Amino acid sequence: MDFNPAANPDLPSAPCHGFGQACVCSQPAGKMNSRRLFTSLLGAAALSPVWAREGVEVGATSRMANLVPAEQVENAGAQQYQQMMREAAQSHALAPASHPQLQRLRAIARRIVPLAMPWNLRAQQWRWEVNLIASPQLNAFCMPGGKIAFYYGILEKLKLSDAEVATIMGHEVAHALREHARERMGKTAATRIGASVLSSVLGLGHLGDIALNMGGQLLSLTFSREDESEADLVGMELAARAGYDPAAGVSLWQKMGAMSKGAPPQWLSTHPAGPTRIRDIQASLPKVASLYARADKPAQRFDIAPALQKR
């Protein structure tokens, strides 16, 4: 059976992350001792000063993320991603390497991925993957560890330009780089063990078990609106540095608004409202305009390629 983009509406949904994680420190994944964990818990709500740099401004990663080892989250993401790809392949819903839309996605990713390293030192160790799933869903995601997937529906139904694809991909990659999943898992773990930790500061080996049990939640984990807004900004900068017009975020959200018509897709349920996102993107465009102006532009335009228009 051939790859059929319209034949698989009931495949497992991607994470409800946004159109979507990673610490700038290189802390080992081994067990924390009690005092270090206690200290981390007391300072968990505090954020480091804003990172002074050219481009968008975001706060540092929350220390809550440190309660769950990065390797554990990334391994869980890799396992779930591979399971999803196996299921898609068994359903003949995984695009072959020759598919024009997959080639397009991978070409755009080759421009964005090298720019990820300054945002997260762990990203250079990730085994990045990009795949296309035959499903009419309006969805895309990047799991912890750089595992990217787009659903055919979001490309076809929205008739995305290359810059709009780069905007979505940048947003999803930003969730991974900023460790939003790991942070939310850390907050959940802290809530579950908070009373016992604060009272005893002893014997917290079960934290690892809690994190492992929570690994299965990656597919259903939702990000906060603050996470989504941050991913919009970081994703816009990644796209601009990669040579894609950052103003594409405006046209993208206009398309999303027209498509949703009061019934937003599943992964938009926790997002800021479309008009709010458009205003925020427009307000931040001056911060990335010079980055886009200086960036090398893509030599190939896939959104005007005849082979792509036929698929």
Question: How does the language model describe each region?
Answer:
Residues 2-311:
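A Zn2+-metalloprotease active-site environment signal
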